[in-house]
Amino acid sequence: MADSLKMGNLSLNESQHAPAPSTASSGRAAYIPPHLRQRQMGANMDGAAPPPPGPAAAAPPQAGGSWGARPPRGGNWANANDFSPRGPNGNTSWTPTDGLRRPFNPNAYGNPGHGGGGSSSSYARGSGDGQWRDGKHIPGPPNPRVERELFGLPNDPSKQSTGINFANYDDIPVEASGQDVPEPVNAFTNPPLDDHLISNIALARYLTPTPVQKYSIPIVMNGRDLMACAQTGSGKTGGFLFPILSQAFQNGPSPTPAPAGGQLGYGRQRKAYPTSLILAPTRELVSQIFDEARKFAYRSWVRPCVVYGGADIGSQLRQIERGCDLLVATPGRLVDLIERGRISLVNIKYLILDEADRMLDMGFEPQIRRIVEGEDMPHVNDRQTLMFSATFPRDIQMLARDFLKDYVFLSVGRVGSTSENITQKVEYVEDHDKRSVLLDILHTHGTSGLTLIFVETKRMADSLSDFLLNQRFPATAIHGDRTQRERERALEMFRSGRCPILVATAVAASGLDIPNVTHVINYDLPTDIDDYVHRIGRTGRAGNTGIATAFFNRGNRGVVRDLIDLLKEAHQEVPTFLESIAREGSGYGGRGGRGGRGRGGNATRDMRRFGGGGGGMGSAPSYGGGYGGGAGGYSSGGGGSFGGAPSYGGGYGGGYGGGSYGNPSGPTGPSSWW
């Protein structure tokens, strides 16, 4: 029955598969794959005979797509008559499908031999298609679409420029120490800045320099190294981007080294030779600096690039191949690309370490030392090195001596402290009451602005955001376990206001510049007072005002002394319960957390002038503060440090980040030296 059963035209006795390629006796032509049929038709139109049937023709020749014989027509890599670009279909044929040969255009993919670092290239390239030609910088034409993307429209809430208290910055004390410190500038003018940069600054609607910019611009333009401490949100990014971009516009690109022996001199160069390198600790921060660099390099020959871990390395490599003059990177991914031979540091003129204390605290010192001292980067005397951060404790300053030469130390305002634009409130809340108090605060303040909530653990971030969603508050979360795509999407929804509540771990605490954050809530207080400074600095930026609320209980008594000092410095109200807990004697001196350095003294003074001094007493030994607190300087006097009990990663030398010293995974990794 099955032998005779037919359904429509389908028979159970007949195979529904295509017949196998026939032999010569069958008289049928060999099977030709679909992607080769058009090529065969083109060959027949040129008068070429089809491949003869039989076993020898079972596999038609592939044009450059196999390890076998090359096609019979000329122009291949063996006899190298010419090098035609790939066909329009993206296949491996070096001849267009219309059968007509196309002459090789050396400018088709950029300037051969100069694709990596932009040297000597006269072709339009860069974030705004500007050019460097005949020793002159020729800006590209305006692009309204790109301008809207980079600078936004007037009164665009996603593009923050200056706030209502910005003029008060003129009253902030500034301390600059070093030999022959240049005079500050009071406006964006030429000199010292390039005219094209000034036009981009005007597009960004920046009217006057911030205090850190007033000093950093002439210091860097005069070729000096710089260590700058400025309160968070005070324009540190512009403080280093403005002078290095201005110098680039005036001086042009550096020549790219000649290809090594055996390398071909045509096509796109695979290794990039940037002239400026900016290192920062987190993916979010390097992305933010890259966006600012694109903004101020608009219509110029300078091409900014960004590389960081957790993202597709292939797309980052393609971006680098298109040209890389200013590179923004995290230390780990940069080391990876150097090992792959895709980036050379031989042309570096400017090395910038942003959030330098965070990078060293997070255990990036081995990678930074390898990048600066172990690769082909020019010697400290042959480059300019700039360090920017909100805090610079003494032991970090001592380490910085290895990277800087004859530097100017710049301290703006109460740095290592907090901005007076931030109203700080400390509430006594037990752990089991935190959710209900948080709901009360959110109901009181509403969602008119952006609210950033900091927690200590990844699990708490997910749990709290789910709780807020169930309470009909639009919330999202970012932490280290989320993919880069998820983190970028969450930040974009938060920035745009579609999701005005963001729950974050410390991954978002350092350096992020998110406009219009009106309220920062420390749901879990950190064990390090510097982390608290970085967290609340996400609001009150660029002269705007903000509110910072901290949930405090006796579990946080390790930071009570530093918290009281911080509130007093910023002229904030000190709750009575903080003073009573401090008097109980359990919170004197140090910062625990990652080994504890102690705040002993002002963490923003120039070590060359004020010497070492002792650290704090440390916090409870179980949290790594231990005995001694800060190292207090090697030869400048002051107490040394044992670093704290090793039960929480204090170990030896607590002033170097405790358990995370030398550990690339940062403070959340295991407490070991590797």
UniProtKB/Swiss-Prot annotation:
Molecular functions per Gene Ontology: ATP binding; ATP hydrolysis activity; eukaryotic initiation factor 4G binding; G-quadruplex DNA binding; G-quadruplex RNA binding; mRNA binding; RNA helicase activity; RNA strand annealing activity
What EC number(s) does this enzyme carry? 3.6.4.13
Q: Where is the motif Q motif annotated in this sequence? A: 186-214
Q: Name one GO biological process term.
A: regulatory ncRNA-mediated gene silencing
Xref: PROSITE patterns: DEAD_ATP_HELICASE, HELICASE_ATP_BIND_1, HELICASE_CTER, Q_MOTIF
Recorded catalytic activity of this chain's protein: ATP + H2O = ADP + phosphate + H(+)
InterPro entries in the record, alphabetically? DEAD/DEAH_box_helicase_dom (IPR011545), Ded1/Dbp1_DEADc (IPR044763), Helicase_ATP-bd (IPR014001), Helicase_C-like (IPR001650), P-loop_NTPase (IPR027417), RNA-helicase_DEAD-box_CS (IPR000629), RNA_helicase_DEAD_Q_motif (IPR014014)
Pfam families with a match to the protein in the record? DEAD, Helicase_C
Positions contributing to ATP binding? 230-237
Q: What is its main location?
A: cytoplasm
The protein's job, in short, is: ATP-binding RNA helicase involved in translation initiation. Remodels RNA in response to ADP and ATP concentrations by facilitating disruption, but also formation of RNA duplexes.
Domain remark from Swiss-Prot or TrEMBL: The Q motif is unique to and characteristic of the DEAD box family of RNA helicases and controls ATP binding and hydrolysis.
What is the protein's given name? ATP-dependent RNA helicase ded1
Whose protein is this, by species?
Aspergillus terreus (strain NIH 2624 / FGSC A1156)
Q: What is the lineage of its organism?
A: Eukaryota, Fungi, Dikarya, Ascomycota, Pezizomycotina
- Gene name, per UniProt, is ded1
